[in-house]
Amino acid sequence: MIERMALNTEGKDYVVGDLHGEYDRLMSALEALEFNTVVDRLFAVGDLIDRGPSSMQCLALMDNPWFFSVRGNHEAMAVNALKGRMWNNWQENGGRWVLKENPPDVSRVLNQAWQAMPLAYEIEVSGGRRVGIVHANPPARWSELDDMTEEVETRLLWSRRRHKTGDTTPVEGIDAVIVGHTVVGSPMMLGNVRYIDTGAYHTRRLTVEPLDQVLACL
């Protein structure tokens, strides 16, 4: 499931790393950037929830017309847990916030957000170039997303293979891809893949970058 977005001709496009409940930190970052909710757009790499203090507020960001997010593995864990699967796994990985919330409210907000989240975004930027966003690990060829198999979906949500192996082979068929999932000390490139999860929930550093800046790093 890939969603393609046309060029933003009115404002700027930004991308943010894994939020993990750090709603206030995001709002501070957007204020510093003078983010304009009328014309600007913000894309997230998934994992809006867990670990930080404000998971419900981060999920509610999906109600805003300027905010877009792909699915992350933490959203996948939460959806499965609320269906009776992987509950302990979710609780051990930051899901305990749900115990302080009204379960029907969590289920409703989470499912609404989940249904609105694609597995990948492809965004047109200046010069006819295209930037992709997935949560964890992109395929070797961007065209693989047009035939979404279970194996491809699992890699998009969970894999760290490229980072672990230091693979700098460019993803074919796309100018650049932005991912989260794997915490890095600062944003970094491997080939044409940019890693932007700087571990905001424990480092207090949340990365928000203009999409055009990502292409400048190539």
Regions found by a protein language model. Give the residues of each.
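Conserved beta-sheet core of the metallophosphoesterase superfamily
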Residues: R155-L218
